[in-house]
């Protein structure tokens, strides 16, 4: 969409219009950079003072923030959610042609649905099934007998190994690898013996996976990613991991094998989670969390020492290193006091 009247935008967003509905909106921008012709949003009332200097032609905000802005506005309950919907309307992501690119190799027995696009130099192996409106970007590899559901898009250079199942309306960013061997080895008197990984990866519907993330195939049981899961860039998801519906995983997270994560969880960036255990539904792990034990109660969990000036951090680290000795001394003092 190149432009839209503010009144028409309000109707599409189910927003209450205040001001001139004939204003033409040509784009969306942050409050600090928005100019005439653009629309912005205020999702945090702490930044209301910025409204007085805002140059946008219109602002999306809540009813209690409306008195702080004199220009045209769209009043909604959740400005951030409305921003997401506006961004979808104004998305400038290029739409690929519905054709087969130069140098693409497609096995004769692969099944392609209607309006499928396969980019240049992509490889589609034997037995693959691609649903309607699937987009396979340039340089992608889709291994034997893999199934990809309708409306799913793989950006350039995604690798999907054999016997993988990806649901409908998924989005997988460039460089991601799905279905590589999990880290499975047996030790024979100092020599590592590889264990073939016989499981698969099963990905549900409406899953989004960021760039350069790796999801390993199961050793025996399948690695499973539930419906509506969102996974950021550069995450490592080991074999046999199960992630429940609508869980969010931020960048750089490492999940060890045979971990089960429940539904509606949020895992902060750079967290490390031990394997062979479970995390229940509705758990939030804050950034750089180190999860070594199962979590059985919903809630917010944190670990680690927040950033401090180096001198203060060194003192804190020294205290942590000596906490066992201090505990022993405290118990000895308590025993003496109890005798008295």
From Swiss-Prot:
Keyword Transferase assigned: yes
Entry-linked InterPro entries: Hexapep, Hexapep_transf_CS, LpxD, Trimer_LpxA-like_sf, UDP_GlcNAc_AcTrfase_non-rep
CDD domains noted in UniProt: LbH_LpxD (cd03352)
Annotated catalytic residues: 239 (proton acceptor)
Tree of life domain: Bacteria
Reactions listed under catalytic activity: a UDP-3-O-[(3R)-3-hydroxyacyl]-alpha-D-glucosamine + a (3R)-hydroxyacyl-[ACP] = a UDP-2-N,3-O-bis[(3R)-3-hydroxyacyl]-alpha-D-glucosamine + holo-[ACP] + H(+); UDP-3-O-[(3R)-3-hydroxytetradecanoyl]-alpha-D-glucosamine + (3R)-hydroxytetradecanoyl-[ACP] = UDP-2-N,3-O-bis[(3R)-3-hydroxytetradecanoyl]-alpha-D-glucosamine + holo-[ACP] + H(+)
GO cellular component term of the entry, any: membrane
One GO process term, biological-process aspect: lipid A biosynthetic process
Pathway assigned to this chain's UniProt record: Glycolipid biosynthesis; lipid IV(A) biosynthesis; lipid IV(A) from (3R)-3-hydroxytetradecanoyl-[acyl-carrier-protein] and UDP-N-acetyl-alpha-D-glucosamine: step 3/6
Keyword entries, A-Z: Acyltransferase, Lipid A biosynthesis, Lipid biosynthesis, Lipid metabolism, Repeat, Transferase
GO molecular function annotation: N-acyltransferase activity; UDP-3-O-(R-3-hydroxymyristoyl)-glucosamine N-acyltransferase activity
EC number: 2.3.1.191
Biological function: Catalyzes the N-acylation of UDP-3-O-(hydroxytetradecanoyl)glucosamine using 3-hydroxytetradecanoyl-ACP as the acyl donor. Is involved in the biosynthesis of lipid A, a phosphorylated glycolipid that anchors the lipopolysaccharide to the outer membrane of the cell.
Subunit structure as annotated in this protein's UniProt entry: Homotrimer.
Family under the similarity heading: Belongs to the transferase hexapeptide repeat family. LpxD subfamily.
HAMAP family linked to this entry: LpxD (MF_00523)
NCBIfam families in the record: lipid_A_lpxD, PRK00892.1
Protein name: UDP-3-O-(3-hydroxymyristoyl)glucosamine N-acyltransferase
Annotated source species: Sodalis glossinidius (strain morsitans)
Lineage: Bacteria, Pseudomonadati, Pseudomonadota, Gammaproteobacteria, Enterobacterales
